[in-house]
Amino acid sequence: MKITWYGHSAFRIEAGGAKILIDPFLSGNPTWKEGWEGPAEGVTHVLLTHGHGDHLGDTLDILKKTGAMLVANAEISSYYGAQGVEGSRINPGNHGGTVDCGGFTTTFVNALHSSSFTKDGSNIYLGNPHGLVLHFPSDKTVYHMGDTDIFGDMALIEELHQPQIGLVPIGDRYTMGGAVAALACRRFFRFEAVIPCHYGTFPIIDQTAEKFIEGMEGAETKVLTPPPGQEVDL
């Protein structure tokens, strides 16, 4: 499995023949200056955790250019269908549901956040936010938490899915901060490795992963903080 972080919550995962982008906020991302074309090369799937603009990002352009499958909640799926994405390439789901993505499955799990898109000064409701658990038959299970606070039912996510890799928001203000995120990882999960995200993008959120790293000291989980664009082989 290969994972590349592009800053904020944008990731590319290559595993089991799939090339997946999650929350592809690439153009306009202050921590990634090289556009969406490179990260989207050969992509087979685009997965979205919720409907905020800094997570939808370049989804429409990527879908039109690559022919990738969209995996998202019902409302986001309908939104992109109305933008001209063919229904055959849209794979919707919702809380608790698991969808077959061809080569892996995605399960929609809870996240404590909000989800809408602002257009022409108005908010467009785009369903509930989610975390996403990706199961690969012959590789590690990945849990992208989306944007969220800590919550007690993370224990059920561990019980049901046993994710080995965690992609964890730590930037505070709009998600849990680093210390709380570390508590979530240590109390509820047995991750082999975690990559913190949703930090350092805008001045209003935490700029470094130091609080998270400090909170994870002594844990068996490996904390990886690659610079944006650097591939990690897991």
UniProtKB/Swiss-Prot annotation:
InterPro entries from the entry? Metallo-B-lactamas, RibonucZ/Hydroxyglut_hydro, UPF0173, UPF0173_UPF0282_UlaG_hydrolase
The UniProt entry's coiled-coil ranges are none
Q: Which Gene3D superfamilies match?
A: Ribonuclease Z/Hydroxyacylglutathione hydrolase-like
**Pfam families with a match to the protein in the record:** Lactamase_B_3 (PF13483)
Q: What Gene Ontology molecular-function terms does this entry list?
A: hydrolase activity
Q: Which keywords does the record carry?
A: Hydrolase
* PANTHER family noted in UniProt: UPF0173 METAL-DEPENDENT HYDROLASE MJ1163, UPF0173 METAL-DEPENDENT HYDROLASE MJ1163-RELATED
What family classification does the UniProt entry report for this protein? Belongs to the UPF0173 family.
Q: What is this protein called?
A: UPF0173 metal-dependent hydrolase Meso_1362
The organism's taxonomy opens as: Bacteria, Pseudomonadati, Pseudomonadota, Alphaproteobacteria, Hyphomicrobiales
